[in-house]
Structure formats: structure tokens, C-alpha cells
């Protein structure tokens, strides 16, 4: 079983970055690089480590900016991966997919029936596994529940 996370609006506060949209339109990676985490880093790393030790895999599926150029996409992919490494240094991500805006996430996931935390309603509707709205259910609380099921 794989637990997937969206980045923007789920674990990274892209939309809370002042002027995020104008930065993206100007093809600046600053909002991606400087986005604050939306989760407690220590707790997320703790529960994901426990779950990985119990056989779960951890993945990220995140979109690139809408209507962006190929050169900007390349820089954004690198920036998002760097953000993940810097923000969650203790997590080994089994999969990281940074894909074109609008790509169906269930098409790129290796585990088509995994768990997905994503703030986008349309993405959750198309997900074949268990979709979770991080705005309705706290990520850490849900990970605790999953851990308890494996105790």
C-alpha cells in the first residue's frame, strides 16, 4: 500500500505565499522554494517512518504550474524535489511524480489503489483508491489511524 501526498495546498502552503500567482506567471520558483509546510514536520516524519517500517510506501504526486514553459517546468521539478528533501530530510520517498498541470494522478501512481491526500476535489473524485481531503481530515490524525490499524 502506498500513501501519496499532493504538495501545493496539501503539505506545502503555496497559496499562502504572498503573490504566489504573479510569481508563477513570471516563471519564478520562489513560492515553491519558500512555501511553508502545512503539516507538523516532526510528526509527519515520525508516522511515515513507522508506516514505512510496516511495509507502506510513500509517494508524492504534484502538478506543475498551469500553462508553463518546458524550461520553467524543469526548474520547478528540481525546486519541488529540493523542497521535499529540505523540509522532510528523514523521509525516503519511494515515488516522486511532478507532472503537467491537470494530469490524472491515478494514471501516474504505481499503486492505483493507494491512499491520496489532495486538496483538489476533482483529483479526489478520479482517484481509484482512498482519497482524503486534507482540509476536512487532519493528515497527522489520519496517519495515526492508519498506524493503529497496523498495531
Language model: regions and residue ranges:
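Acidic, Mg2+-coordinating phosphoryl-transfer loop and its flanking beta/alpha structural elements
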Residues: 114-151
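A short acidic, often aromatic-flanked loop/helix-cap motif at beta-alpha or helix-coil junctions
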Residues: 93, 101-107, 136-144
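Conserved Lys-Pro-Asp/Glu-containing loop-to-beta segment of HAD-superfamily phosphomonoesterases
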Residues: 2, 97-122, 127
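A structural micro-motif
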Residues: 1, 56, 91-94, 114, ...
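Alpha-helical substrate-recognition element adjacent to the catalytic core
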Residues: 2-87
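A short acidic, amphipathic alpha-helical/loop segment
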Residues: 43-50, 107-109, 126-129
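Acidic carboxylate-rich catalytic motifs and surrounding loops in phosphoryl-/glycosyl-chemistry enzymes
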Residues: 62-67, 94-104
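Lumenal/extracellular "mature" regions of secretory-pathway glycan-modifying transferases
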Residues: 75-78, 91-98, 133-134
Amino acid at each position: 500500500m502506498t500513501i501519496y501526498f499532493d504538495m501545493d495546498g496539501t503539505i506545502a502552503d503555496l497559496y499562502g505565499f504572498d503573490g504566489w500567482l504573479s510569481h508563477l506567471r513570471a516563471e519564478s520558483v520562489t513560492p515553491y522554494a519558500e512555501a511553508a509546510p502545512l503539516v507538523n514536520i516532526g510528526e509527519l516524519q515520525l508516522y511515515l517512518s513507522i508506516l514505512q517500517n510496516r511495509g507502506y510506501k510513500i509517494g508524492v504526486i504534484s502538478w506543475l504550474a498551469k500553462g508553463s514553459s518546458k524550461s520553467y517546468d524543469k526548474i520547478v521539478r528540481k525546486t519541488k524535489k529540493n523542497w521535499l528533501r529540505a523540509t522532510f530530510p528523514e523521509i525516503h520517498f519511494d515515488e516522486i511524480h511532478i507532472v503537467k498541470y491537470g494530469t490524472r494522478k491515478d494514471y501516474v501512481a504505481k499503486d492505483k489503489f493507494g491512499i491520496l491526500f489532495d486538496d483538489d476535489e476533482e483529483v479526489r473524485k478520479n482517484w481509484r483508491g482512498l482519497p482524503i481531503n486534507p482540509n476536512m481530515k487532519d493528515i497527522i490524525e489520519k496517519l495515526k489511524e492508519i498506524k493503529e490499524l497496523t498495531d
